[in-house]
Amino acid sequence: MERYLPTGNEMISLPKLNEQTAAIEDLTFLSMQQRGMIELCGTENVPLMQPFIQIDQEELALTGLQWSREHFWIPSGHKETEQATVKFTVLTPVGERGFAMRLSVTARTDCRLKLGARGLWSKSVHCVNEEKELTGQAYIYESAWNSSFIMDYRVGFPAFALAPMSDHAGKSEWAQTEDGISYQISCALDAKAGQEEAFTIFWGLGFEEVAAATSAKEQLRRGWDWLYRKTADWLDKRTVQLPTPELTEVYNVNQFFCLFYATGRTFDTEELICATSRSTRYYVSAAYWDRDSLLWAFPTILRADAALAKEVLTYVFTRQRQNIGVHSRFIDGTMLEPGFELDELVAPVLALQAYRSKTRDEAFLQERFVQDGLSLILARLREARHPDTALYETFLQPTDDEIVHPYLTYDNVLVWRALQLLADWRPAQRGSLLAEADAVRAAIFTHCVKKDADGQPYFAWSVDLAGHHDVYDEPPGSLQLLPYYGFCERTDVIWQNTVRMIRSADYKFSFAGKPIAEIGCPHAPWPWVLSLCNSLLCGHAEQALRELTIMPMDNGIACESVDADTGECTTGSAFATCAGFLCHALLTACKEGSSCGTI
């Protein structure tokens, strides 16, 4: 399996920086007008961007670089050869509409260097879960704006453009063929033994020629050192130190992946959006889920950047408000996949409470658009309530798969908590909302608690109020999280019996006894990373921390599920919102004093 080192900023994502070849295989950015993500690609044999180094006219293979993530986010590979020490670094500067790639060489003898990048822009793709190739026309041409070439795409008018500028006078070459647009940017340098020589290419993105070229020029004027320092300072300010280097790396790599891949700004309207992932390697990329963004990613976003968290909530209660509780949506808020999901309906309430608790920003709660959103949530809750019993139905489960029975215990626990919060925020309705919350709690214990063959009580996964129920659990919305949401204590016998059942080797989707002893489900029948998160939050942290130290996941980044023996990714690579929940669960477990090193 290919190993990638994704990086990116608010505007640009580079999901496929290949460790083995040092190639940048694709580049993505968000478009509000197109309701999703645009990806620029090379081919299987010729990447979009390939750095190269020639020493005395002999090309040095950039395979097998030793890679690191500087400041837990900036990919940098180095290599020692008989001729030189070489380094390749990719920087996606915060606040910039572009990125930079830098090659540096310290030769062992005096020599002639040629440093640069070449590549092929073969196609452009629209991505929202599925990929559809665009049918406009790509162009490349010389421009006085950057003293090099501009690559742009037109659909009768400009759609987007990409422009390079370099910190050394060099040579730009290009050609347009049936395979696409090929190009090369290079400079020649005379190197002295032991003296570092470097070449940086700044790439700018824009709507058209001038916007792209000046985005590159802005970076050039600032310079590599300034951009690097600004970005490193931004990353360092948000870096969290955990008791061991291994856990510190897991946390921070996944934190920055969440911040930059679960949120982003559209290049055309510059609006903040939330998405499952800005990587096309995730199978439902560039779309919005309330659950994913607000229950999983939001806690980590909030800890890292309260201002960003406020912007996320503003996006949710404005752009996304009309379809809160609907399965999935485009980034502009319109419906993508229909289907009512109860946990998603109340997710904004839980995220809003987390924000209030962290910031004490009571004024935000009183914003008209927030109040309108809360009123809409209450109205939709009323529609989902059973006419006689205080339980609320859903059509889809937390995996987005169809229900067996309509009343999910986990979902109704979230409703109970949301009603409590809404009662605090709405004094005029406080009495009725608290009464309803109490009624939901009572209904859960009356209708959702069953007994096993030995007469021991447990929480059913779902019920139909006609005597039927199922014993089941889903990592995206687990019964293990009931104490986490405050519904019961970890000492509660019913909850303990429930957890024992679903973690037992007798349970169909349990991987008890395996190195990764987590839980799966039919949606992905392998151990889920979200299950590991649940373990961190429900009193099984020591086991989960041991697993985490041996799980490669997706080259260190959270994925949907992993192999039970190796911990390698099996499904759902580059799962950005899950990365956020992993960070939140890990930090919570550390604060609770779980053992792994000295926590």
Predicted segment positions?
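Long, well-ordered core segments of solenoidal/helical folds
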Residues: 254-266, 304-327, 369-390, 435-455, ...
